[in-house]
A protein has these predicted regions:
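Anionic, Ser/Thr-rich low-complexity intrinsically disordered regions
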Residues: 1-125
Length: 125
């Protein structure tokens, strides 16, 4: 029994694809699980475009976060850490809008609601 809303499934699929690429396949079981469920969804060029855009965002976030997550942030100035935090926020805002677009593409009723937030809404694909 699956409990993930489709927008979360797609987001986690994109993360798993990035992780697979960045870790030489260390998460193969995880990726296979998401890919299997993804194959059960209706396919479309719009969905493929949204998935590619979300995957690109996750790659960009990975690039911005790696030093912070590996404990070598002392190599960065506070100004650079702040710049990265804002860039990550902006990428996440776009990611949330893409997730909601995915829900619309697949006619799924569950969307991510943000109130008084930069990520409110959808993105046209």
């Amino acid at each position: 029994m699956d409990f993930l809303p489709v927008l979360e499934l797609i987001d986690r699929l994109c993360i798993a694809r990035v992780k697979h690429a960045r870790t030489q396949g260390a998460n193969q079981t995880e990726l296979d699980w998401y890919e299997q469920r993804f194959q059960q969804l209706p396919q479309s060029p719009e969905l493929d475009q949204a998935i590619q855009a979300m995957t690109d965002i996750h790659h960009a976030i990975w690039d911005l976060e790696w030093q912070l997550k590996s404990g070598v942030e002392q190599m960065l100035s506070l100004q650079e850490i702040g710049r990265r935090a804002i860039a990550i926020r902006d990428f996440n805002n776009r990611r949330i809008a893409l997730k909601n677009s995915v829900a619309g593409i697949l006619n799924h009723p569950v969307t991510e609601i943000k109130q008084d937030h930069l990520a409110d809404g959808e993105i046209d694909i």
